[in-house]
Amino acid sequence: LPYMRDARIRGIPALGAGAVWPVPLADVMVDPFELPDHWPRVYALDVGWNRTAVVWGAYDKGIDALYLYTEHYRGRAEPSNHAAAIKARGSWIPGVIDPAARGRTQDAGHQLYADYEEQGLNIIAANNSHDVGIYAVWERLTTGRLKVFRTMVNWRNEYVKYRFDEKGHLVKKDDHLMDTTRYIVV
């Protein structure tokens, strides 16, 4: 397969047999371009102490294509730091957040979801169904309706590792931007 050849010849990480979305990066990544102002924007947020990840998307209604154009990928920072990074990319952009944030705390008894709302973010709970999200992303990838700017290095690194284990279970490791991708597509 072409992606295996690239891995062996050029040392480029490849999508393996257990890849969640076995679509070569070359078919997904695009050179950055200026996004038209009229394209709707949204971001998706996956929160955590070790890693908080955010991905931003712009939607071209004319061709039903979603472009992921920037990312925030940082660990060990307070919600106020992440919120500032989110607002710096457009405080007017609405977002979706991992619904599990309603139950997570960084300090006694306070929900992360509420922390982000208090920081002024316009967020709603994302649909966190793995099956629904994986299928929705797969549908867009295989029809060329999900594209990712090449500048999203962390996204690319996670994409090539996102896989199912030998028993068919999703490997929940280094998948924060893949989670945000599911949230933003659904």
What are these regions (language model features)?
Residues 1-45, 50:
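ATPase catalytic-site recognition across NTP-hydrolyzing enzymes
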